[in-house]
Amino acid sequence: MARKEKNRSSHKNREYAVITYFFLLMFLGLIAYFVYFQLVKSDKFINSPYNSLQDLFAKNVVRGEITTADGEVIARTVTDADGNETRKYPDGRMFAHAVGYAVNGKAGMEKQENFTLLRSHDFFLTQIVNDISGTKNIGDNVISTLDYKAQNAAYEALDDYDGAVIAIEPETGKIVAMVSKPDYDPNTISADWDEVNGDGSTALYNRATQGQYAPGSVFKIFTALEYYNEFPDTYEDYEFDCDSEITRDGFTIHCSGNKSHGTEDLRKSFAKSCNSSFANIGLTIDNNKLNALCNDMLFNKDIPIEFESKASKFSLSNSDTTALTMQTCIGQGNTLVSPLH
């Protein structure tokens, strides 16, 4: 009898232990998720335009400045004698798509760094005094990677053409210039909203990150790289006689300006951007391998950037036609790339 009671007691103790460990694991899991949320996810949720906490922050903090990497202020808040705040953009349209705007849902850095701009790291005693006196704290500033001179050069070079210019520091990936046209004046975005956001207007569209265009001859870099990958020991022996065009299976590719480049190796074909030679190379390499190479080079993938962007598109297989293969390998066909990519 005593043994049965002892076994029953031992069984109950095991049950209690299992329940205790179960709730302990749940508790530890909640703590782990809380820490993960605070370190990784909190800024994203707080920065969401749908988060009403932002309105609370805005009531207590004067939005911080946005500057270029070389110290030029490109967005700031001006407060008049009555306490009315106005967001000012000293350079107007020049930084429009990069900086964005802070109204109507926000865009650009104003949107991506909204939480930072509305968060204040003023000295805590200063914040206490401000709270008592009803004075707003000064928000944190955002220092961008943009270079003022590079941005100005890109803006002036694009002039009145529709298109985009983006300059990236190759060693770090820092964006030093980003221009998209048509553009808008962020200083008057509220008054101009119906015009810039109306049917037929693309002024709000950031072509630098969201535009998709045929890459043209720049794609020959990938065609040449795939040829080198497939023929690492013999690529220097490549030779092609260009007479301004190439015809295969009834389809013809012409060189720019119908120019004849004569006898070329791979280097000369690349240097002269010879369409005929690269169409010929395209028929030599394996389409499936070229497709794999392009996927490795971030085609068909989202670029890791906080700005709204579109993925570059590439698709080519060994079952595709000769015509499509030739077009694709000179940067035409169905291939689309974003200026960011």
Which residue stretches match the model-derived regions?
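Periplasmic/cell-envelope proteins involved in peptidoglycan metabolism and beta-lactam response
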Residues: 1-193, 203, 212, 238, ...
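Beta-lactam-recognizing serine transpeptidase/beta-lactamase-like catalytic domain environment
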Residues: 2-3, 70, 171-217, 222-341
